Amino acid sequence: MSPSSDVADGDTGTGDLFADPEDYYPPTPPPTFQTHTLASGRVLTLHLVGYSPTEAHHLWNGSRVVSDYFEAEPSRVQGKTVLELGAGAGLPSLTAGILGAERVVVSDFPDVDIVMTMQKNVDEAGDLEGVVVPKGYVWGADVKPLLAEIVKTSTEGEEKKEEGRKFDVLVLADLLFRHSEHGKLADTIWDALARKEGSVAYVFFTSYRPWLRHKDLAFFDVVRERGFLVEQVFEKKMEKPLFDGDPGDLEIQKTVSGFEVRWPKELLEEGKA
């Protein structure tokens, strides 16, 4: 059959000449898991996606330290509504649920694998169904879908959505290295944090790139410009850096810093107006 006949039949004769070889792109690494032991001795298995450009395939030190911070004083989350941003495995959310939070929304980028992995961690925790809810969320976007997950169980066992409720507690663990997203994170705190006394956003982080620590800390300038109060409340030196062999000051790489972001009195009063 002549080449012209091939073209007439819709076959250009090139076959797979321009197709990428099967091994052209490296395969996505398989999912992994890590464990975390609570103060009670309970061991949580934390599944992670094999790889994500949003870094959801790591269990960050900030997540472990926030979890410990909640365990040290359970009243920080007991009976409260909690939203975790950029959660990955969602360890702080699981811990909050175990400690008696009323409702926890564990959120990360709306990638199917990430959300399904968060759901798997909730399911395997065993007793958090109806308490911890995974959601896909892009920082700075409309928070209404997150707020819609705040529910209260009545004495009859029926769940009733409470209009106008926001989150008592926000968790931001190891998110500040995404410098371009600081404004969007501040927007979400503004929109999602309940405007009442006692509401707080816990921002824990390590400067994994020590030479850019000033850019990590610039997040707090952004939230101060919005009118929030900022206070450092915690610091812990880990035994070793999360990533072996990274350049820069090892002591900074081992340090987890914890800050609280709260509403000032004048903005609380403005919210009541």
What are the functions of these language-model segments?
Residues 1-273:
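S-adenosylmethionine-dependent methyltransferases
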